[in-house]
Regions:
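Bacterial lipoprotein signal-peptidase II cleavage site
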Residues: 35-43
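Beta-strand-dominated extracellular/periplasmic modules and repeats
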Residues: 60-259
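N-terminal secretory signal peptides
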Residues: 1-15, 21-33
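A generic alpha-helix propensity feature with a strong bias for hydrophobic helices
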Residues: 30, 50-51, 66, 109
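Ser/Thr-rich, Pro/Gly/Ala-heavy low-complexity intrinsically disordered linkers and tails
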Residues: 42-60
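Residue-level detector of intrinsically disordered/flexible regions characterized by low predicted structural confidence
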Residues: 7, 11-14, 51, 56, ...
């Protein structure tokens, strides 16, 4: 699949994470591009665009040359704008494949409409760019796309006080009953697709928790009706690189579960 590069500094470049996802409906398919980092492949039961036809969502990225290590400092360290729609360019002929649903999991509760979902938490800055298209590769506007994931320590936020739907949330499991997590809403957010079928979110690369590979949950809604609930993840080597070399992740070491 295609990959892009993100240059953050003219002299010493640090690797930010820029992730682009192409989501298609009717039938639903998903393609994932990661930019500014190592090659990565997701774990969700999805299929990529015409550049790849396996049963995984692929996230391919070329490492920056002469980089000065992974960026840190959370979303406040971002110095570049979101990339234009050429990020999603693939083949000249439209070809999509089915995306399977994945479990919602026990850590979901409905969140807020946000551009930056980090709530000033630390971590590897990540641009999450998602584009929703139909089976003819036409963009779909007016759809809600919601994402949620854990922090660098593998902990989910747990402040459900303003949530319209927290019926399935397992607070003890997801927050570990940590005081900070119980009062937080970090790494959760909703955005509505624009005329290009696209949303842009600022976040940080998620950490890991026992028995799960690193992943991000997402759901797509139209007129308050779920169109898809699923997850995507990243290749073992990509996650190992971050968890071994990034100061915000290295204290926990490599994930205990890989793809």
């Amino acid at each position: 699949m295609t990959s892009k590069k993100l240059t953050e500094k003219p002299l010493k470049r640090r690797r930010f994470m820029k992730t682009a996802v192409g989501l298609t409906l009717a039938p639903i398919a998903i393609g994932l591009w990661g930019c500014g980092g190592s090659n990565s492949t997701s774990t969700s039961s999805t299929a990529s665009n015409s550049s790849s036809s396996n049963n995984d969502t692929d996230s391919n990225a070329e490492p920056e040359e002469d980089f000065d290590g992974w960026a840190s400092g959370g979303t406040s360290a971002m110095t570049s704008d979101f990339p234009d729609d050429s990020l999603f360019d693939t083949a000249s002929v439209c070809s999509v494949a089915l995306t399977g649903s994945q479990t919602e999991g026990p850590c979901y509760f409905q969140s807020d409409y946000l551009d930056d979902i980090s709530y000033e938490q630390t971590g590897l800055p990540m641009m999450l760019c998602l584009q929703l298209i139909d089976e003819a590769c036409n963009p779909l506007s007016g759809y809600e796309i919601e994402v949620w994931h854990c922090d660098v320590d593998g902990v989910y936020s747990g402040d459900t006080s303003d949530s319209a739907d927290a019926s399935g949330f397992n607070s003890a499991f997801c927050t570990g009953n940590e005081v900070d997590a119980l009062s937080a809403k970090w790494f959760r957010g909703i955005a509505v697709t624009d005329a290009s079928g696209r949303i842009n979110l600022k976040s940080c690369f998620p950490g890991w928790y026992s028995s799960r590979a690193i992943h991000i949950h997402f759901r797509i809604r139209r007129n308050n009706t779920d169109q898809l609930v699923s997850q995507f993840g990243f290749s073992d080597s990509f996650c190992q690189d971050i968890c071994t070399n990034h100061p915000d992740y290295s204290h926990r070491g490599e994930p205990d579960t890989l793809l």
